[in-house]
């Protein structure tokens, strides 16, 4: 193949050459370009088992592989290296060193199941596997919290127990499709499927039912909710959605182009929004119902370079060699500049005013990419986490604070399932309690008063009270939507 054309009209071209190496001999792509201006040169060195790809901007990325074709190293366009280490016999990934130098290590059982993941911080996540079904039996996160899984005689997931030993149970039909879900509270949900494996009916814990109907081509034709309201869907000959008719008679219409991409939308009020697209499907212009236009410009590699809004004001964007946004300029000339680390996480944001001057915010991160400190011209804020990446403490100090002055501190604690249990500040402690479904049921305030939340069904908020006083009550319809608040 030397050329193919997408439905939108964009053409893609390829050049080839014959290569013979120590592992194989084959035709390989040596060049690639598109109508919109993308250009790539592919340089193969089969003796070294390497491939380098250079685009028209002069950016080059390279891969190296071993005799089995497994990638052993990757160098990105910024020159940053990522390396991979594989086992000799099973060819399992044993380790990876990321572009920042962080080392990841992987351990497997004798069947090749991943049992341990060690991250650059030394944290370990573990998995034990079912000996017959080769599905996880126990998963333990880096903080030691465990999720346990049970299976039936056909290998279907039968029950899940969370770190608080709260159990969710699943029932199946003869096709292995879930037909019943029993939550930790004992509430049941029921599902019914057709012979094509499509959901036909859902009955929630309150007995409310939603039904789905399909046409002979298995396309969704109608949805009838628990209030007996039906929404209907229509399609063109290619299966693209063209119309949605709601229960009250309102209609939305959609017009796709030959490639199935939306180019026109008509609202129930008859207001029309149009989109003009290029050969690759990118929106070039959007025109709303009042005739106002928003325009989008891209470079040859699909990066948004200019956005011109309805008032004719333009926002401009610049990128680095890794396609990361590095600068944004608004219509008034104000600039925002971004810096990144080797893991592509933002490490600096510089705000530039239209009259000059800059404000810099620095962001420090650990080897796992978590934000550990934010430095502004006025303050330094530190963040501390537990092994499961839950935020434990925020500590903020003014740069001009007196020697020995106390910083502002907020502390958090959690249960093993990740529910927030307490929030502590200088003003006191908020303490929270939850039901078996993870819904917050109580918040005790620093003055000793307790805010309580009452639910029904699978967690629909019904009442909030403070002591003996009702703060608010909620009335809901059969779809559990709030219809009245008092």
What are these regions (language model features)?
Residues 1-486:
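Extended charged/polar low-complexity repeat regions
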